[in-house]
Amino acid sequence: MNALIAVQNNAVDSGQDYSGFTLIPSAQSPRLLELTFTEQTTKQFLEQVAEWPVQALEYKSFLRFRVGKILDDLCANQLQPLLLKPLLNRAEGALLINAVGIDDVAQADEMVKLATAVAHLIGRSNFDAMSGQYYARFVVKNVDNSDSYLRQPHRVMELHNDGTYVEEITDYVLMMKIDEQNMQGGNSLLLHLDDWEHLDHYFRHPLARRPMRFAAPPSKNVSKDVFHPVFDVDQQGRPVMRYIDQFVQPKDFEEGVWLSELSDAIETSKGILSVPVPVGKFLLINNLFWLHGRDRFTPHPDLRRELMRQRGYFAYATHHYQTHQ
């Protein structure tokens, strides 16, 4: 298992009262905050959105914002700014979100509604070509024959950014645990760029800004290659990344060696967090300066984990990738 970084004081005022939810620092890192909706908020939200099945959210995209407004109204309109503030804050940028009373696979549709509401308070989730919807649900089992590491249980899924092989801006990534059976291990792995001890070395390398080709396997349903550098800067000139080791295609020896060394430097970082995510909870991270992955599982013939993801853009910020949008 990867090492945890030391717990430090967090800027969040744990004594502040919020309406409908709590917000506290996590045990893993001062950069990761835990937001929990109260049982009453959860119950009222599900009652007020019950008239819309998930299919309605799929077909009518404006309803995704409607359910977001319902959730924010239940939280006295404190929720939206308190989601955006840490997500746009370089010192934080990550939330672990939970709703009391949503914790069973039988509530999978309710989980999708909740995650959709949260995501559409900060921006809009992009079309996911793998699923054909604005979200994707997928299952990890003990045996896998797919064409990427996404569903392979017995190895580490290396740290990466999402949205590397599409042209849409991918500011945020949301990853929700829908089901888990006969499961040991498989924690989420996170690395904040500013906690990566080799950032300066690789960010200043001549290849850091060279556009490289990114190509996805057939399961992603994306046939067009995209070109962009591994590193870029935000509006304030700070490093951001668009990187995944599986899909970047080096054109020559120089690029291949550099990418291999970069991968090793990321995977061996002492700043990696190992974060358990129970059923019903989800991580929401700033994709520009957080890398994410997954630790390996302990083998079991009936192992099963179901996940849901959404990824999209912030509607309230302009500091995307500055040179290669």
Curated annotation (Swiss-Prot):
Domain of life: Bacteria
Residues the entry annotates as binding Fe cation: 160, 162, 292
Reaction equations catalysed: glutarate + 2-oxoglutarate + O2 = (S)-2-hydroxyglutarate + succinate + CO2
GO biological process, one term: L-lysine catabolic process
Pfam families linked to this entry: CsiD
Cofactor(s) annotated in UniProt: Fe(2+)
InterPro entries referenced in this protein's UniProt entry, alphabetically: GlaH (IPR015038), TauD-like_sf (IPR042098)
Gene3D superfamilies named in the record: Clavaminate synthase-like
Cofactor binding description: Binds 1 Fe(2+) ion per subunit.
Pathway: Amino-acid degradation
Enzyme class label: oxidoreductase
EC number, as in UniProt: 1.14.11.64
Keywords, in A-Z order: Dioxygenase, Iron, Metal-binding, Oxidoreductase
Keyword Iron: yes
Molecular function terms, GO-annotated: ferrous iron binding; glutarate dioxygenase activity; oxidoreductase activity, acting on paired donors, with incorporation or reduction of molecular oxygen, with 2-oxoglutarate as one donor, and the other dehydrogenated
Stated family: Belongs to the glutarate hydroxylase family.
Subunit structure: Homotetramer.
Functional note: Acts as an alpha-ketoglutarate-dependent dioxygenase catalyzing hydroxylation of glutarate (GA) to L-2-hydroxyglutarate (L2HG). Functions in a L-lysine degradation pathway that proceeds via cadaverine, glutarate and L-2-hydroxyglutarate.
Protein's name according to its UniProt entry: Glutarate 2-hydroxylase
Organism of derivation: Shigella boydii serotype 18 (strain CDC 3083-94 / BS512)
Lineage of the organism: Bacteria, Pseudomonadati, Pseudomonadota, Gammaproteobacteria, Enterobacterales
